[in-house]
Structures are given as C-alpha cells and as structure tokens.
Curated annotation (Swiss-Prot):
Subunit structure: Part of the 30S ribosomal subunit. Contacts proteins S9 and S11.
Alphabetical list of SUPFAM superfamilies matching this protein: Ribosomal protein S7
CC annotations in GO: small ribosomal subunit
PROSITE patterns in the cross-refs: RIBOSOMAL_S7 (PS00052)
HAMAP family: Ribosomal_uS7_B (MF_00480_B)
Protein name listed in UniProt: Small ribosomal subunit protein uS7
Superkingdom of the source species: Bacteria
Keyword field contains Glycosyltransferase: no
Keywords, sorted A to Z: Ribonucleoprotein, Ribosomal protein, RNA-binding, rRNA-binding, tRNA-binding
GO biological process, one term: translation
Function of the molecule: One of the primary rRNA binding proteins, it binds directly to 16S rRNA where it nucleates assembly of the head domain of the 30S subunit. Is located at the subunit interface close to the decoding center, probably blocks exit of the E-site tRNA.
Pfam families: Ribosomal_S7
Length: 156
C-alpha cells in the first residue's frame, strides 16, 4: 500500500459573473475538450433563459435544483464471503453536490431540444420543481438504499 499522505482537494474558485462556486462546478462538468469559455457561455445562457422564463433570480432556481437533485443515501457494492451486497451508505455533502451536478448535466445532454443551453435550462427548471430525470435518478437511488436496508450493518 502507498505510504503517501492524502492530498488536499483544491478549492473550487467561484465564477466571475455570479460569484458562485456551484456555477463554477457546473461549468467544469459541462466543459468538453478543454473548451471552458464555450461551457461558460452555455451555462450563462441557460441561467439567463431561466431568469426570463420564471422572473425569479436564476441563481436561486439553480441552487434549488441542485438541492432537490442531491441524494442523501446511495448504495455501494461490498463483497462478503463470495457474495456481493449493495450496502446503503450516507452521502457526504460534497459528493452529493457532485452527483447532483453530474446527473443534471447527463440528463440535460440526453434531452430533446435545439441547444444545450435550452436543454440545461429545462432540466434545471424541472429539478427546481421536483420533477425531471435528475430527480427520478435521486428517487431511484433512495429506493435502492431503502430496499437494501437489511445490509446496512456491512457498512465500512
């Protein structure tokens, strides 16, 4: 086993427009092939669309969407004596946020629509209203954890 210590995670700098770490994180998630300015434009266009459609502060809607899509528990595979059990585990705050952002981006990519900005805006609005694929994924994760509650004592 490695003798090196655990490396500290670098803090995510807030983005320049909204001064928000969450916006910066979703920009990084959307980015492909190092094209960060394109990813930023997609996110800012989506947030502008949200503000025009709802009349509310786009950042608040975005934060509510992330909060609604964040899972509280997940299952992890654990091998015990030749059998693999799905053990329910609590999700740490940082991982929960990361999973929520990952799901929001993943399902906005698979959505029908013309531009990525509009698809992202629709997914965020759905998540803020407790519907959409990201919310369904969170509910499915919670159901899996509930179904495997009997194996909770295998937690590590």
């Amino acid at each position: 086993m490695s003798r090196r210590g655990v490396i500290q995670r670098r803090p995510v700098p807030p983005d320049s427009v909204y001064n928000s770490r969450l916006v910066s994180m979703i920009i990084r998630r959307i980015m492909r092939h190092g094209k960060k300015s394109l990813a930023a434009r997609i996110v800012y266009d989506a947030l502008k669309t949200i503000e025009e459609r709802t009349g509310n502060n786009a950042l608040e809607v975005f934060e509510r969407a992330v909060r609604n899509a964040t899972p509280l528990v997940e299952v992890k595979a654990r091998r015990v004596g030749g059998a693999t059990y799905q053990v329910p585990m609590e999700v740490r705050t940082e991982r929960g946020t990361t999973l929520a952002l990952r799901w929001l981006v993943q399902f906005s990519r698979s959505r029908p629509g013309r531009t990525m900005a509009s698809r992202l805006a629709n997914e965020l609005l759905d998540a803020a209203n407790e519907s959409g694929n990201a919310i369904r994924k969170r509910e499915e994760t919670h159901r899996m954890a509930e179904a495997n509650k009997a194996f909770a004592h295998y937690r590590y």
